[in-house]
UniProtKB/Swiss-Prot annotation:
PANTHER family: HISTIDINE--TRNA LIGASE, MITOCHONDRIAL-RELATED, HISTIDYL-TRNA SYNTHETASE
Gene Ontology molecular functions: histidine-tRNA ligase activity
GO cellular component, one term: cytoplasm
Function: Required for the first step of histidine biosynthesis. May allow the feedback regulation of ATP phosphoribosyltransferase activity by histidine.
GO terms under biological process: histidyl-tRNA aminoacylation; L-histidine biosynthetic process
InterPro entries the record matches: aa-tRNA-synth_II/BPL/LPL (IPR045864), HisRS-like_core (IPR041715), HisRS/HisZ (IPR004516)
TM region positions: none
Pfam families: tRNA-synt_His
Pathway, per record: Amino-acid biosynthesis; L-histidine biosynthesis; L-histidine from 5-phospho-alpha-D-ribose 1-diphosphate: step 1/9
Name this protein carries in UniProt: ATP phosphoribosyltransferase regulatory subunit
Length: 383
């Protein structure tokens, strides 16, 4: 069973327009384009446990390969090979299709392909590379003409908060507690054999999310002063100012954990609430350990990036008006064909979309029908 994308022409046009608009923003921030291979080494993906092996789509002719489930791993690997001598920091952007499969009913799988666009910032010698990456995300989305009813929220967390929450349970129901917190499973948490006071704290944190300053204060009251909370306080102080300029809300969710096992540190999602229908537009986070894995000798071991779902974004844009001039060239006599070819080229050099009808046409009513069939805005007769 497969989820094959058969886009109509409008979808294809909108996809291309969105990707081009995003690429133009990335370039203004100094990012260079890269195109990772569609084929990944299976052991590279499995070795880093980036994604569940059951979600990978293998290659029948070579069991050691798979279609790429995401692009970050391939790009980070390049920094230790072809890009090893490139000056740091490395700023890259990409766009393309990723592939995965999801378990469906009766032990069958549903194949999926998703078009995405994103950036990677690797080995940036600064404490908070998140500031640049999230700023670019806001700028990129701001350059896309979204529908007015799309209210944006950046949901942020860090794997370090979950580490802080689970610190006292390393030898006592660690995995069970983590699963309950990530899945917001109040019922299973209630059944665990742990101290009642601890259980009450975990229950309170289970549905804790909101304005970062308020959530950080709550965490500080529970866990006291520590580096994790202080660093988040500094980061959100800057991000909150940036988000206000773009009219994007920021929420801190201590229990949010990403699906891909790429990230260690800050993780985030950009969510659109369109009339109470929530859509994830973008995902991202830090992957310092992935950088270390591929290049342990890297002097500045950090990496962060995001991916934007073009498929989801396309459903939320205001479609651009297609009133661009498009000329249909017609002639009444066959001997005018050569002149028509020259005229078509002359108009195209001026940037005018031009279609030359290769058969003679002597009927004005037929000419109007041809103009509509070719979606042209006007007719020019070759004389």
């Amino acid at each position: 069973m497969s989820d094959i994308k058969e886009f109509n022409l409008i979808d294809v046009r909108n996809n291309s327009s969105i990707v081009n608009d995003l690429n133009n923003v990335y370039k203004l921030w100094g990012y260079e384009e890269i195109s990772p291979s569609f084929i990944n080494n299976l052991e590279t993906i499995k070795g880093r446990e980036v994604i569940d092996g059951d979600e990978l789509i293998g290659i029948v002719s070579n069991s050691s390969l798979c279609l790429r489930p995401e692009m970050t791993t391939s790009i980070v690997k390049l920094t230790s090979t072809r890009l090893l001598n490139k000056k740091r920091p490395i700023r890259l952007f990409n766009s393309g299709i990723v592939f995965n499969k999801k378990q469906s009913y009766k032990n069958t799988y549903k194949f999926q392909e998703n078009l995405q666009s994103g950036i990677e910032l690797i080995s940036y010698d600064t404490q908070y590379p998140e500031i640049e990456v999230i700023n670019i995300l806001f700028d990129a989305i701001d350059n896309i003409n979204l529908i007015d009813s799309c209210n944006l929220t950046l949901l942020v967390s860090t794997t370090k908060i979950m580490d802080l929450i689970l610190f006292n349970y390393k030898n006592n129901n660690y995995e069970e507690i983590k699963k309950c917190m990530v899945n917001l499973d109040h019922e299973s948490l209630d059944k665990l054999n742990i101290d009642n006071n601890d259980k009450a704290i975990l229950k309170e944190l289970l549905f804790t999310r909101g304005e970062p300053a308020i959530i950080l204060k709550k965490l500080k009251n529970i866990y006291g002063n520590n580096n994790v909370i202080e660093e988040l306080d500094c980061l959100f102080n800057t991000l909150s100012k940036i988000s206000k300029k773009y009219n994007i809300k920021i929420q801190l969710d201590p229990t949010y954990q990403p699906h891909l096992n790429l990230y260690a540190g800050i993780v985030f999602q950009l969510i659109c609430d369109n009339k109470n229908v929530k859509t994830i537009i973008a995902k991202g986070g830090r992957y310092d350990e992935l950088v270390r894995y591929f290049n342990p000798n890297e002097k500045i071991i950090n990496g962060i990036g995001f991916t934007i779902s073009i498929d989801n974004l396309r459903e939320l844009i205001v479609e651009k008006s297609q009133t661009k001039k498009k000329v249909l060239l017609l002639f009444k006599n066959s001997y005018l064909l050569d002149k028509g070819i020259n005229e078509q080229k002359a108009l195209q050099k001026k940037g005018i979309i031009t279609i030359l009808y290769l058969n003679p046409c002597n009927d004005n009513s037929k000419a109007n029908i041809l103009m509509k069939e070719h979606n042209c805005t006007e007719i020019q007769w070759i004389k």
